[in-house]
Structures are given as C-alpha cells and as structure tokens.
C-alpha cells in the first residue's frame, strides 16, 4: 500500500550528471496525511532536492506544481499528466487503505501519518535510498531489503502494520524498484536540468552587531552572513589566527531569493573584544575570505552616535523655538 505514496518518484529515466556538485544530495517526497475523523482528512505532499523544495501537490486542482523552472526535468507535458493521474489515484487508495485499517491498528482519531521516501547521491553516484513512515511524529515502520520492518520502539502496532503491508510482495517489489532504480535516474535528470541554478555562486555579505547583553561587564558579539549560495559556509570568531571555540553558530536559514543566512555569536568580557574579528569562508569568495574587525565596528558605532546625538538635539531645539514663536 505504501508504494502509492511515492508517485513523484515514478518518473521516466533521464540523462544527467552531477558534475560540480560535490556535497551529498538527496531527492525525497514527503507525504503528510492528517486524519481528523473517519471522513475528514487533509493531504500535504512536497518534493525536495535536499533543502530546496522543487514540487508540491495542489489538492484543489489535483495537479503537480513545479516550483522551479527546471523542476520538470527532461520530461514532456504528457508524461507529467500521466504522473498526475497516477498520483491522484494512488493518493485516494492510500487514504482508503489507512482508514480501512485504522481501527484494526488501533489508530485513534485524530492522528497523523508522515512518510518520507527518496534516494541519495554522493559525488554523482547513488549512495542509498530510504522510505520511512512515522505515526504521530514518532518512528513507526521503514522499508528495507524489499520488505517493511517495524521500529523496535513502536511496539505491536507497528509489527501488525508491517504484517499487513508485507502481504502483497508485488507492491513491495514496485516500491523497491522506485527507490533503487527510478529515483536515482530522476535525481540525475533533475540535476542536469537545474545545473545552471544549482551550480551558481553567490557571494555572501557580512556585518557585525551587538546581541542581547549576557550579563554585567560582558558583550555578545554577532556576525551576520547573508545572501550566499551554495549552502556550505564557514564562519568563525577569531583572535588573530586563533579560532574562538566559544563561537556559537545558529542554523543556516533560507532566504526568499533562494540564498542562505547564518549568524555566529560570541560572548566575551567587555575589555576583551577589541582584537576580535569574524572570518567568513565560502566557495564563491575563491579563497579571499571576508574578515570583519570588531574594533572597526565599535569605532563606526561611536562616530555615528557622536553625529546623531547632537543632530537630534539641534532638531529638538529648533522645534522648541518654532513652537514658542507660534505661541
């Protein structure tokens, strides 16, 4: 039954290569099904190339939505129409199957099923595939070696679920083929179609700021790095050539334009900040690291403060005198 949740992987073979893309890549389809009661349900489906969403499913029109100009890969409109029909039919059957077995499996409404399936590439070669199902956000079952296996922590419910799924070996064979054969060909074709976008280099911008005070006599220094692509980046607070091990990196977050943002913080005593710097390494910089010195940031801040405060005072005095003239 669960092979029906992978129709976006069921694409035709495509040529392609992953030249220039050295980091591990994956293509996966995520299916989230929310069952509020026996008749009310919600369906969310998306396709992802690593961290980049490339496809989604419009439940109202029952169509695949291509989020990038190259998301279609090398396939014709007719081929994608066939996939939409396949997806529509199999999604309905998947809902019916889960709802049919909900009572037998002791699924209590409301509940949520999450499925993620796909394949991985490393240095242009297939390195593995995966298909996992979660129930209520917890690991439940996974597909391995052509059959469904329960997670040990999932208990008897998961064992019974696997027993149901493994009754039809033909469907398991289809699932295995989708993961081990069709998906790798699809991701290679997708990489070829999106090569210009995926291999672009966008230089980061960086700036420094104060963070919330960590306590009396201490400062939080913040180094912001934004607008870079691809995602891998190295950011570190330095004292001379010595890396500061207290550097805390946040998550690398996506921006609306498809680039990335990161901030790195460091807490120090106020008197120890002067000779610190933030260093940024990124492939787009071609070895010319960005280095920002905290003492320069502080000097600029004092200059701005020295200019703005008197200016505000002059404006205030001018408004006060003007008000007195009208009285």
Swiss-Prot record:
Ribonucleoprotein keyword on record: no
GO molecular function, one term: endogenous lipid antigen binding
Bilayer topology annotation: Single-pass type I membrane protein
Cytoplasmic-side positions: 322-327
InterPro entries: Ig-like_dom, Ig-like_dom_sf, Ig-like_fold, Ig_C1-set, MHC_class-I_related, MHC_I-like_Ag-recog, MHC_I-like_Ag-recog_sf, MHC_I/II-like_Ag-recog
Record keywords, A-Z: Adaptive immunity, Cell membrane, Disulfide bond, Endosome, Glycoprotein, Immunity, Immunoglobulin domain, Membrane, Signal, Transmembrane, Transmembrane helix
GO biological-process terms attached to the record: adaptive immune response; antigen processing and presentation, endogenous lipid antigen via MHC class Ib; antigen processing and presentation, exogenous lipid antigen via MHC class Ib; immune response; positive regulation of T cell mediated cytotoxicity
Other noteworthy facts: During protein synthesis and maturation, CD1 family members bind endogenous lipids that are replaced by lipid or glycolipid antigens when the proteins are internalized and pass through endosomes, before trafficking back to the cell surface.
Protein name: T-cell surface glycoprotein CD1a
Gene: CD1A
């Amino acid at each position: 039954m669960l092979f029906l949740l992978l129709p976006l992987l069921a694409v035709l073979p495509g040529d392609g290569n992953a030249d220039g893309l050295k980091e591990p890549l994956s293509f996966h389809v995520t299916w989230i099904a929310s069952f509020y009661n026996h008749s009310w349900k919600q369906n969310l489906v998306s396709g992802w190339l690593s961290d980049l969403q490339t496809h989604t499913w419009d439940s109202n029109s029952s169509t695949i939505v291509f989020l990038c100009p190259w998301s279609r890969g090398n396939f014709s409109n007719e081929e994608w129409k066939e996939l939409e029909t396949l997806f529509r039919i199999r999604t309905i059957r998947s809902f019916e199957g889960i709802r049919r077995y909900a009572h037998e499996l002791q699924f209590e409404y409301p509940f949520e099923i999450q499925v993620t399936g796909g394949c991985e590439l490393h240095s242009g070669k297939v390195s593995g595939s995966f298909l996992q199902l979660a129930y209520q956000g917890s690991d439940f079952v996974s597909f391995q070696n052509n059959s469904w296996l329960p997670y040990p922590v999932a208990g008897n419910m998961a064992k019974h679920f696997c027993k149901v799924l493994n009754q039809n070996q033909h469907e398991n064979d289809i699932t295995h083929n989708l993961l081990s054969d069709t998906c790798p060909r699809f991701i290679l074709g997708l990489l070829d179609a999106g090569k210009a976008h995926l291999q672009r280099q966008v230089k980061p911008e960086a700036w420094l700021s104060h963070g919330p005070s960590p306590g009396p006599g201490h400062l939080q220094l913040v180094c912001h790095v934004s607008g870079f692509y691809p995602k891998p980046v190295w950011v570190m607070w330095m004292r001379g050539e010595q890396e500061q091990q207290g550097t805390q990196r946040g998550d690398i977050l996506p921006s609306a334009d498809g680039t990335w943002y990161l901030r790195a913080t460091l807490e120090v005593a106020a008197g120890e900040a002067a000779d610190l710097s933030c260093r940024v390494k990124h492939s787009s910089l071609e070895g010319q690291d960005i280095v920002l010195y905290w003492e320069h940031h502080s000097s600029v801040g004092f200059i701005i403060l020295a200019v703005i405060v008197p200016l505000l005072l002059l404006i205030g005095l001018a408004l006060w005198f003007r008000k007195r003239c009208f009285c």
